[in-house]
């Protein structure tokens, strides 16, 4: 029997309201015991003194680019970034080439990620065949094959009747629709519609492109009983709309990309195309509302929207591919809120663990006895720099490149096996 003890760490598990200095005994890949001073002579020991010990992080929004665009990232490099960022489970987006609208692609991803053997990779299927927004994909067989949600991420579903049908089907299958909300008639440009787009003379994306679709899909979720999960929420009004539906008891949840908490549209003036993302970085007022939304629990979880693109695809803002990498920077970014006294570490961990687990309906994100021993161990104060040496992605598109970051994952354990060590 393989035994491991994580000793002397400060354990925080929001799923069972557990917080304090404890040892964790892992046996055969499962959580066996959490107690003070566990002694098992034959067990391997990980000394976590001075470190935070919590359930393995879950990221429900990752672009692995595999199959089809493996020059940007692949399942192996993406998995390496994930475990280095503390994520033991990631949900990958279906805008691959070919897209995940058939079971062959699902099986390929599941097999390859298993053979890489670092983190759990849970695929999503497309809402519509070919992500074309017209014909609904075969949800039933995609779910059977292992998809945990459906999304046309990267593109909105413009046709309301298609979205209604998708929510009806998803409701029958008990899975969420993950919703990239941006009406493409109002969001066709490259950055937020506002002072910076005016200053630089750049084409833009209006905030109401997002808000209108959230309102529509909240109504459709109410009508169908389906669960709509709003991806990368980015404006103040979006949050007000989400709160409205939550108060009515509609099944609506949402995530925030930590980059939207750190930066505004003005970051384009510093980082150029590396600050180009869809939905775009918004105004200060929006950024502050998002932070408030985290604090008040209107936002359910962090999700990185890790979206790798090569440097040649990020030269000019006007022509750049949208997206920012984020698996390795999510924890230090979120810790900024903790350091400013806005949220507790417990709240931060909840948003990386049990909350995303609940959204996709998996029994993970917890250290409950008998659960898979997925454990993240981090130092909230360790400083490091994301650069050539530390970056594990094939891409480097982030405004945080070369910046000093505070907070570092020291060990990541998945199913009782160490998959990352600083
Ligand atoms: O900025 C983005 N990049 N937003 C998306 O929705 C898609 C993603 C990508 O695939 O690059
Ligand atoms: Zn998206």
UniProtKB/Swiss-Prot annotation:
Binding locations of Zn(2+): 61, 63, 153, 305
**UniProt note on regulation of activity:** The monomer has very low activity by itself. Activated several thousandfold by formation of a complex with PyrB aspartate carbamoyltransferase (ATCase).
**InterPro entries (UniProt xref):** Amidohydro-rel, DHOase, DHOase/Allantoinase_Hydrolase, Dihydroorotase_CS, Metal-dep_hydrolase_composite, Metal_Hydrolase
Please tell me, according to the UniProt entry, what happens when changing residue 232 to A. Answer: Does not affect activity
Q: Name one GO molecular function term.
A: allantoinase activity
Q: Report the GO terms under cellular component.
A: cytoplasm
Is Methyltransferase set as a keyword in this record? no
- A Pfam family cross-referenced in the UniProt record is Amidohydro_1
**Highest taxon, organism lineage:** Bacteria
Enzyme Commission number(s) of this protein: 3.5.2.3
Pathway per its UniProt entry is: Pyrimidine metabolism; UMP biosynthesis via de novo pathway; (S)-dihydroorotate from bicarbonate: step 3/3
Give the residue spans that cross the bilayer.
none
Enzyme class name: hydrolase
Summarize where substrate binds, as residue positions: 63-65, 95, 278, 309, 322-323
User: What is its cofactor?
Assistant: Zn(2+)
Instruction: Report which reactions are catalysed by this protein.
Output: (S)-dihydroorotate + H2O = N-carbamoyl-L-aspartate + H(+)
What does the record give as the active site? 305
**Cofactor detail note:** Binds 1 Zn(2+) ion per subunit. Fully functional with a mononuclear metal center. Does not require a second metal for activity, although the conservation of the second metal-binding site during evolution leaves open the possibility that a second ion might bind in vivo.
Biological process terms from the Gene Ontology for this record are: 'de novo' UMP biosynthetic process; purine nucleobase catabolic process
Give UniProt keywords alphabetically: Hydrolase, Metal-binding, Pyrimidine biosynthesis, Zinc
Q: Which family does it belong to?
A: Belongs to the metallo-dependent hydrolases superfamily. DHOase family. Class I DHOase subfamily.
| Quaternary assembly | Monomer. Forms a 1:1 stoichiometric complex with PyrB. The complex exists as an equilibrium mixture of heterohexamers, composed of 3 PyrC and 3 PyrB subunits, and dodecamers. The complex has both DHOase and ATCase activities.
Q: What does this protein do?
A: Catalyzes the reversible cyclization of carbamoyl aspartate to dihydroorotate.
The entry's protein name is Dihydroorotase
Native organism is Aquifex aeolicus (strain VF5)
Per the UniProt record, the lineage of the source organism begins with: Bacteria, Pseudomonadati, Aquificota, Aquificia, Aquificales
């Amino acid at each position: 029997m393989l035994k491991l003890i994580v000793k002397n760490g400060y354990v925080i598990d929001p799923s069972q309201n557990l917080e304090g200095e404890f040892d964790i005994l892992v046996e055969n890949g499962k959580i066996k015991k959490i107690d003070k001073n566990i002694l098992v002579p034959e067990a391997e020991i990980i000394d976590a003194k001075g470190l935070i010990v919590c359930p393995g992080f879950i990221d429900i929004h990752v672009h692995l680019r595999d199959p089809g665009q493996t020059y940007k990232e692949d399942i192996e490099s993406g998995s390496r970034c994930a475990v280095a960022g503390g994520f033991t489970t990631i949900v990958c987006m279906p805008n691959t080439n070919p897209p995940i609208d058939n079971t062959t692609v699902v099986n390929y991803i599941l097999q390859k990620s298993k053979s890489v053997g670092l983190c759990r990779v849970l695929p999503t299927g497309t809402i519509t065949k070919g992500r074309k927004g017209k014909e609904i994909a075969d949800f039933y067989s995609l779910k059977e094959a292992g998809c945990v949600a459906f999304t046309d991420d990267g593109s909105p579903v413009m046709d309301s009747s298609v979205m209604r049908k998708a929510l009806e089907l998803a409701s029958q299958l008990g899975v969420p629709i993950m919703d990239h909300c941006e009406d493409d008639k109002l969001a066709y440009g490259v950055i937020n519609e506002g002072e910076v787009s005016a200053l630089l003379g750049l084409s833009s994306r209006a905030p109401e492109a997002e808000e209108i679709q959230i309102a529509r899909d909240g109504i459709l979720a109410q009508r169908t009983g389906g669960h709509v999960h709003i991806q990368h929420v980015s404006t103040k009004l979006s949050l007000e709309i989400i709160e409205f539906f939550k108060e009515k008891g509609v099944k609506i949840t949402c995530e925030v990309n930590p980059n939207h908490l750190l930066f505004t549209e003005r970051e384009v003036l510093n980082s150029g195309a590396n600050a180009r993302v869809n939905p775009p970085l918004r105004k200060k007022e929006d950024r502050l509302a998002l932070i408030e939304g985290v604090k008040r629990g209107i936002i359910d979880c962090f999700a990185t929207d890790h979206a790798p693109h090569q440097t040649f695809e990020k030269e000019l803002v006007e022509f750049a591919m949208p997206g920012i990498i984020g698996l390795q920077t999510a924890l230090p970014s979120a810790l900024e809120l903790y350091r400013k006294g806005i949220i507790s570490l417990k709240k931060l961990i909840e948003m990386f663990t049990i909350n995303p687990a609940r959204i996709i309906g998996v029994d993970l994100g917890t250290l409950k006895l008998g659960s898979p021993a997925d454990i993240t161990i981090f130092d909230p104060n360790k400083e490091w720099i994301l650069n050539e040496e530390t970056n594990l992605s094939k891409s480097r598109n982030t405004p945080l490149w070369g910046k000093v970051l505070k907070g570092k994952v020291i060990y990541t354990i998945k199913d009782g096996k160490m998959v990352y060590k600083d």
